[in-house]
Amino acid sequence: ANWGVAPHVSEGIEVDFSRFESYRVEHEADWQEKWGAALGPNDLILVATAQVLKDHPDLNAGFIDGAICRYNEVNLGVAIDIDAGLVVPVVRNADKLSIGEIARTVRELAVKARENRLTPDEMEGATFSVSNLGGLGIDWFTPVLNPPQCGILGIGRIQRVPRYSGNEIVARDLATLVLTFDHRLIDG
């Protein structure tokens, strides 16, 4: 987004995925059997993002013709890297889907994207986007707004790193999440 049109700010935070990673490994076969897809950190982040957007409607909004438009639906754009470049299909009503339904939907959209079979309807109407570059080995990045959306979440790779817990050093699975948002909606 043009900075002069949409002044944007990015803020990052380190998130501990250790408990999730343990849960994921323990229940991987169950998820595969029930949903046809292994559960990944991206699925958890998409579910959490959808719920947070319901609680913070200023981020589930857009600027249309110079006016703020707060959306009633939470439709997540999910960035997918294909040979031809980046596409951002939409998971509709993500706030009403279970983690398994989101996992299955994203995987179906990814297959369609890689086979160049996404329909225009599957590419339009996102109210907020999520971009995960962790699979490419990226630790953190500044995601770019997709106007008229007012927010996008960037996800870096999960790394096992040493951290203090009291007087002990323990291994933790950490990733950096970066939120880029339009400053006109948040403290602007």
What are these regions (language model features)?
Residues 1-188:
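C-terminal catalytic/motor cores of large multi-domain enzyme assemblies
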